[in-house]
Regions:
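Active-site-proximal, well-structured secondary-structure segments within enzyme catalytic domains
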Residues: 1-81, 88-120
């Protein structure tokens, strides 16, 4: 876990809160709408977190199972000269853990592609 805690802890908290609030629209989460290191540490502490046992810990488990399954599949496919490839998104959804965690890193008013002044 220690090598993945930078992304796994915020992700687990985000998933747990999204389940509690029944939405990923984090700006609707009241005082939990703003994420910081203290909040993440508080909500991932197994001794004191009100969401740890049913939410955060479950996400840790799911991510571990996914890791093990992908590792096994990758090892199996490697025997046949097949490699698994991932995909990197160009854009980020404003309802994502990345935006909740570090909103200052994203601009949502950028336009891509042809502008309205371009006419064929």
């Amino acid at each position: 876990m220690s090598e993945n805690q930078e992304w796994l802890k915020p992700y687990a908290v985000f998933c747990a809160l999204a389940e509690i609030f029944q939405t990923t629209e984090h700006w609707l989460w009241g005082h939990l709408a703003k994420c910081d290191d203290k909040l993440i540490e508080k909500l991932t502490d197994p001794e004191t977190s009100p969401i740890y046992s049913e939410g955060v810990h479950f996400v840790y488990y799911l991510q571990w199972r996914l890791h093990m399954q992908l590792k096994e599949a990758s090892t199996y496919l490697k025997q046949f000269g097949i490699a698994l490839k991932g995909d990197l998104p160009i854009g980020v959804d404003k309802r994502s853990v990345d935006v909740w965690r570090k909103p200052e890193l994203f601009r949502f008013y950028t336009k891509y592609g042809r502008t309205s002044r371009c006419v064929r």
